[in-house]
């Protein structure tokens, strides 16, 4: 039986934090010229009028500026965080007080997390979203998996593989009991999703290959002004912030092992070296390994590096990169953290369920593990994103790049009709995003003469590089 109900207004930790949140949002706006330029450009046009946007993305001060930009452009928005530890409670309170339904607080349980994700997919009048802003793909996953369950209800009888899957299936079980065609109706109304991060993009391509993707998707992550800025320069600053706030450790003189040398790994390795650490990189890709070596980093296997490192950082987006056996072999007082999207890069479940290991909570998001040999290890943010779990994430300026791309992607999906596939934003928009951020940092561009433009075969107004160009 289908029922129509009014959607919940909001659920946050403490609405009285709204004034503090608003003050920080106003500061962030000054550091986010891309988003503010879009507000000015589209003032009065409301290019997202009629759009119902479900946002599953870290509920931070910077995200608040994105949310209010989407609202300014005409959208009806509901929001949740995409990580149980990443919400800044004062940011959530400010957005809730401004009238946007937000369901997020720092330190959610997995059951609460998936409940919050469900709330953003339930608009007034029993409607679902017609657009999604996703980070990691959980909102998209809930719709896709719910749709599959409606086709094959026996899926609800499966034994969950872990606590996260158990919590997700519980929400889907409740939805199915209320309306066994809910997700078919939601999917039919969807115009698309824009995905923020590498992990979520991998999910989208996998769904597309399997024929499971139900609506168009724009891969925001691989826009140059996202991956080469947010992933690289953002991590270069926020990793150290998270480690230091959590531990107060001196990085200089330490050995830091960075697992993975993609854009995120590059930012992390350079960050740690800039603080005076000796950095060892582990890699599976010969190209990335060669890049790391050419930058002067030692490249080794984890089996060799595990005995040397004082600090370990996973950046791969893969699972079981640091195993329980690795952790048992580490030096005394090692610090272990992750800056990839999910918590399965480190075998946290195995660690927590090992009866020979003693666990002592030091403070929120900092846990001490004592092994049978007497050595101890500190795990930050329970193996989830250290920069958001133990600090406040990337700086506003670099997030303006990413979120300007997200806003443009939402406009693109709303105003045009796309076939089901995974797309990227055109290079002209990528260049425009960069251009919007130049004045703020005092950059003046050289302009091609007509003769120069003709000589290299481009327009004087861009795009300046072919699609295959690697920045």
Curated annotation (Swiss-Prot):
Gene3D superfamilies: Adenosylhomocysteinase-like, NAD(P)-binding Rossmann-like Domain. GO terms for cellular component: cytosol. Disulfide bonds: none annotated. It is found in: Cytoplasm. NAD(+) binds at residues 197-199, 231, 260-265, 283, 318, 339-341, 387. Coiled coil: none annotated. Pathway: Amino-acid biosynthesis; L-homocysteine biosynthesis; L-homocysteine from S-adenosyl-L-homocysteine: step 1/1. Keywords: Cytoplasm, Hydrolase, NAD, One-carbon metabolism. Its cofactor is NAD(+). The keyword Hydrolase applies. GO terms for molecular function: adenosylhomocysteinase activity. The keyword Cell wall biogenesis/degradation does not apply. Binds 1 NAD(+) per subunit. May play a key role in the regulation of the intracellular concentration of adenosylhomocysteine. NCBIfam families: ahcY, PRK05476.2-3. HAMAP family: AdoHcyase. This is Adenosylhomocysteinase. It comes from Chlorobium chlorochromatii (strain CaD3).
């Amino acid at each position: 039986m289908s029922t129509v109900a009014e959607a919940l207004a909001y659920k946050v930790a403490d609405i009285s934090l709204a004034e503090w949140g608003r003050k920080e949002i106003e500061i962030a706006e000054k550091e986010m010229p891309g988003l503010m330029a879009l507000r000015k450009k589209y003032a009065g046009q409301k290019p997202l009028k009629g759009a119902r946007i479900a946002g599953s993305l870290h509920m931070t001060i910077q995200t608040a500026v994105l949310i209010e930009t989407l609202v300014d452009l005409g959208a009806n928005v509901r929001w949740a965080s995409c990580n149980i530890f990443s919400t800044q409670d004062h940011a959530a309170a400010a957005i809730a007080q401004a009238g946007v339904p937000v369901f997020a607080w720092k330190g959610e349980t997995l059951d609460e997390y998936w409940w919050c994700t469900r709330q953003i997919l339930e608009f007034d009048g029993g409607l679902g979203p017609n657009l999604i802003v996703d980070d990691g793909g959980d909102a998209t996953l809930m719709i896709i998996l719910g749709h599959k369950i409606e086709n094959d209800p026996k899926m609800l009888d499966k034994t969950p593989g872990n606590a996260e899957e158990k919590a997700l299936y519980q929400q889907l079980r409740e939805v199915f009991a209320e309306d066994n065609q809910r997700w078919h109706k939601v999917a039919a109304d969807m115009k698309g999703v824009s995905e923020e991060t590498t992990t979520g993009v991998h999910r989208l391509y996998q769904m597309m290959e399997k024929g499971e993707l139900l609506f168009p998707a724009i891969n925001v992550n691989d826009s140059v002004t996202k991956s080469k800025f947010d992933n690289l320069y953002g991590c270069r600053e926020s990793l150290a912030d998270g480690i230091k706030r959590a531990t107060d450790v001196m990085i200089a003189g330490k050995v830091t092992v960075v697992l993975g040398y993609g854009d995120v790994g590059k930012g992390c390795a350079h960050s740690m070296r800039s603080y005076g650490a000796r950095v060892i990189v582990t890699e599976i890709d010969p190209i990335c390994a060669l890049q790391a070596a050419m930058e002067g980093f030692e490249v080794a296997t984890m089996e060799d590096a595990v005995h040397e490192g004082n600090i370990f950082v996973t950046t791969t987006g893969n699972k079981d990169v640091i195993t329980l056996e690795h952790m048992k072999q580490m030096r005394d007082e090692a610090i272990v953290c992750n800056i990839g999207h999910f918590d399965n890069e480190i075998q946290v479940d195995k660690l927590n369920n090992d009866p020979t290991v003693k666990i002592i909570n030091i403070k929120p998001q900092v846990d001490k593990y004592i092994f049978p040999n007497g050595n101890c290890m500190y795990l930050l943010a329970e193996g989830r994103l250290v920069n958001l779990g133990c600090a406040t994430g990337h700086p506003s300026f670099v997030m303006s790049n990413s979120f300007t791309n997200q806003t443009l992607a939402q406009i693109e999906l709303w105003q045009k009709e796309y076939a089901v596939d995974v797309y990227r934003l055109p290079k002209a928009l990528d260049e425009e995003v960069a251009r919007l951020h130049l004045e703020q940092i005092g950059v003046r561009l050289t302009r091609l003469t007509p003769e120069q433009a003709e000589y290299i075969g481009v327009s004087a107004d861009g795009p300046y590089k072919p699609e295959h160009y690697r920045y």
